[in-house]
């Protein structure tokens, strides 16, 4: 697969029981989204919901808050889409997301925050990876173009000539590629699709992005 500067690298092989699968995994800069005006609650418990990638960091923050300020922090790691939705519905004080609010969400946040804009606070930097599970094949190489064609359904088998050309000397099976992706709204999905749109624009169109999978 290509990096953003155009160089190639290898997807990570996923060591699971699932066979012959390709998974889209991504988390770049995860964010906390909250109101810029007066907080909903300055005593007792701060509630948040969202990206699982932030869970460990928020656990550390929670330890500091209770120790230094006597304030509890409760975070429900259900995914970026759910976190943003619960924030906009005023169910939680802040939402965690792997991608910022889109234009519609930002507009809705003005009502949520009583006329104030929502703040995006960069919180965690996490790696981006494409994982695959193909027993007996290590060090698989894919370009961004080939990867986009897999996710679009233009390449459907592991021994497709375009994949074989990128992996000389490797024995690739005549098996269908099963693409696995998030079914819910996900900031991870948004980041993967933005990567594909940037690195393989002839295959993955610029408008095929967002928290819902477009492949």
State each model region's role.
Residues 160-192:
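Extracytoplasmic/periplasmic solute-binding protein
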Residues 185-215:
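Ligand-binding pocket segment of bilobal, Venus flytrap-like solute-binding proteins
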Residues 2-27:
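N-terminal export and membrane-targeting signals
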Residues 25, 29, 91, 154, ...:
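Alpha-helix boundary/capping residues
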Residues 31-34:
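C-terminal motif of bacterial Sec signal peptides marking the signal peptidase cleavage site
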Residues 38-164:
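N-terminal segment of the mature folded domain
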Residues 133-135, 170-179, 209-215:
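Flexible glycine/proline-enriched surface loops and loop-helix/loop-strand junctions
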């Amino acid at each position: 697969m290509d990096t953003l500067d155009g160089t190639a690298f290898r997807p990570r092989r996923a060591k699971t029981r699932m066979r012959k699968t390709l998974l889209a995994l991504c988390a770049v800069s995860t964010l906390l989204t909250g109101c810029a005006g007066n907080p909903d609650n300055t005593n007792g418990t701060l509630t948040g919901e969202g990206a699982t990638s932030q869970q460990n960091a928020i656990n550390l923050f929670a330890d500091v808050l209770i120790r230094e300020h006597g304030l509890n922090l409760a975070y429900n790691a259900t995914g970026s889409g759910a976190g943003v939705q619960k924030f906009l519905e005023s169910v939680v004080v802040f939402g965690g997301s792997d991608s910022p609010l889109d234009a519609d969400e930002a507009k809705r946040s003005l009502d949520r925050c009583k006329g104030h804009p929502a703040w995006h606070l960069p919180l965690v930097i996490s790696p981006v990876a494409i994982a695959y599970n193909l027993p007996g094949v290590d060090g698989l190489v894919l370009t961004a173009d080939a990867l986009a064609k897999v996710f679009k359904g233009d390449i459907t088998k592991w021994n497709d000539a375009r994949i074989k050309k990128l992996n000389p000397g490797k024995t690739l099976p005549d098996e269908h590629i099963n693409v696995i992706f998030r079914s819910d709204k996900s900031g991870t999905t948004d980041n993967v699709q933005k990567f594909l749109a940037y690195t393989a624009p002839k295959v993955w169109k610029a408008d095929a992005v967002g928290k819902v999978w477009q492949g």
